[in-house]
């Protein structure tokens, strides 16, 4: 089928050359509009209908949905367009110039995960999409590396219900059917300052936090005892105390203390239940010291995710790859896409290269990834 798509490596090169960093720090954050426009042109050239969706409450970020075919069901291939920032002093190559060396493609986003769209486009370049018996959707999202705002908004607003979805995160082509979630909170104690020579005239926030931490440790033990998912290498929800700040002088009663913590829930645990358990753990401190303890989110929470192991998608992909599905501890957009349809996480490149200086994708993934995309499209959109 005739089209004007550039060669695979030139598509890859153009994607890497188009910066699309997402960061909580405004000075580093970038719009992904230029990258979305690139993808829109290429998918239109293949005969897809393209919708560009502004994502609310972001700094000029967009989702893209390319669709072709008719009827219900079908297949969704998804990925995010953004990358993390880069540490200029630790890269030995230009992060925005695709460099091939020693059977590796170097550049920011080669593995995580702008390159996945180059594989999709290349796998479809010779396909007459008008002959599909079921729909094929390509979703490109924004801000996965920070808030996952793009996937959240798409899942909340779309009417699409594909038969199944694949998110092309770097899994070394090992299919992933489940991962833990992530919830991070700030616990803040507001005390009353005063001179350390007269403790009764103040309320020491560090002492109150000591009480709160003891109860949080009891919650950690409870989570470990009560909840299990044996497929994970760490088969229980983890709770970590990551940072604490409080006080300003040894001779002053501490007026404020703040603890940052996270919990990584198992699939099947709801965020509401988890918040309830945290609230119950801290209730004695709140009751004894009314108005002095607050809990706030550091980042929007991400639930755990699991694709049913007996679903057709799992069976088909395991047969195509000759590999069993696995589970991982890191988070993806899968919990949000899973609300629409059964979802697997599966893509080229290693997660060990994600967020690293001199990020790369090994060229050994090129041929099997093209073949896999062609096979899953054929199976779910032509059968």
UniProtKB/Swiss-Prot annotation:
Binding site for Zn(2+) 2: 112, 145, 355
Compartment(s) where it occurs, according to its Swiss-Prot or TrEMBL record: Cytoplasm
Principal location class: cytoplasm
Pfam families: M20_dimer (PF07687), Peptidase_M20 (PF01546)
Associated pathway: Amino-acid biosynthesis; L-arginine biosynthesis; L-ornithine from N(2)-acetyl-L-ornithine (linear): step 1/1
Protein origin, superkingdom: Bacteria
Residues annotated as the enzyme's active site: 82, 144
Cofactor(s) for this UniProt protein: Zn(2+); Co(2+); glutathione
Cellular component aspect of the GO annotation: cytoplasm
Stored Gene3D superfamilies: 3.30.70.360, Zn peptidases (3.40.630.10)
Binding-site list for Zn(2+) 1: 80, 112, 169
Catalytic function, reaction form: N(2)-acetyl-L-ornithine + H2O = L-ornithine + acetate
GO MF, any single term: acetylornithine deacetylase activity
Keywords on record: Amino-acid biosynthesis, Arginine biosynthesis, Cobalt, Cytoplasm, Hydrolase, Metal-binding, Zinc
Keyword field contains Amino-acid biosynthesis: yes
Cofactor: how and how many bound: Binds 2 Zn(2+) or Co(2+) ions per subunit.
Subunit structure: Homodimer.
NCBIfam families hit by this protein: AcOrn-deacetyl (TIGR01892), PRK05111.1 (NF003474)
PANTHER family: ACETYLORNITHINE DEACETYLASE (PTHR43808:SF1)
Name of the molecule in the record: Acetylornithine deacetylase
Organism: Klebsiella pneumoniae (strain 342)
């Amino acid at each position: 089928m005739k089209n004007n798509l550039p060669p695979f490596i030139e598509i890859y090169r153009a994607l890497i050359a188009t910066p699309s960093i997402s960061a909580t720090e405004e000075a580093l954050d970038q719009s992904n509009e230029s990258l979305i426009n690139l993808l829109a042109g290429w998918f239109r050239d293949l005969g897809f209908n393209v919708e560009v969706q502004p994502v609310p409450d972001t700094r000029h970020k967009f989702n893209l949905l390319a669709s072709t075919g008719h009827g219900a069901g079908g297949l969704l291939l998804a990925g995010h367009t953004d990358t993390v920032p880069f540490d200029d002093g630790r890269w030995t190559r230009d992060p925005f110039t695709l460099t091939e060396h020693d059977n590796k493609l170097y550049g920011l986003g080669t593995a995580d995960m702008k390159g996945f769209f180059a594989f999709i486009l290349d796998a479809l370049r010779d396909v007459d999409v008008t002959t599909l018996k079921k729909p094929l959707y390509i979703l490109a999202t924004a801000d996965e590396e920070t808030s996952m705002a793009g996937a959240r908004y798409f899942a909340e607003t779309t009417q699409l219900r594909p038969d199944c979805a694949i998110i092309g995160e770097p899994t070394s082509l090992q299919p992933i059917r489940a991962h833990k979630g992530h919830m991070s909170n700030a616990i803040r104690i507001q005390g009353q300052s005063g001179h350390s020579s007269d403790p009764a005239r103040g309320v020491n926030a560090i002492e109150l936090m000591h009480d709160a931490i003891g109860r949080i440790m009891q919650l950690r033990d409870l989570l470990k005892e009560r909840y299990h998912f044996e497929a994970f290498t760490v088969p229980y929800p983890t709770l970590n105390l990551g940072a604490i700040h409080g006080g300003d002088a040894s001779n002053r009663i501490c007026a404020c203390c703040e603890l940052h913590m996270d919990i990584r829930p198992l699939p099947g645990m709801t965020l509401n239940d988890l918040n309830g358990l945290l609230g119950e753990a801290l209730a004695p401190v709140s009751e004894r010291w009314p108005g002095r303890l607050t809990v706030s989110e550091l980042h929007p929470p991400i639930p755990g995710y699991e694709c049913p192991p007996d679903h057709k998608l799992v069976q088909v992909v395991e047969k195509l790859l000759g590999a069993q599905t696995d589970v991982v501890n890191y988070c993806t957009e899968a919990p949000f896409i899973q609300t629409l349809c059964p979802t697997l996480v599966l893509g080229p490149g290693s997660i060990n290269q994600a967020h690293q200086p001199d990020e790369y994708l090994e060229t050994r993934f090129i041929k099997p990834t093209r073949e896999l995309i062609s096979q899953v499209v054929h199976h779910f959109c032509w059968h």
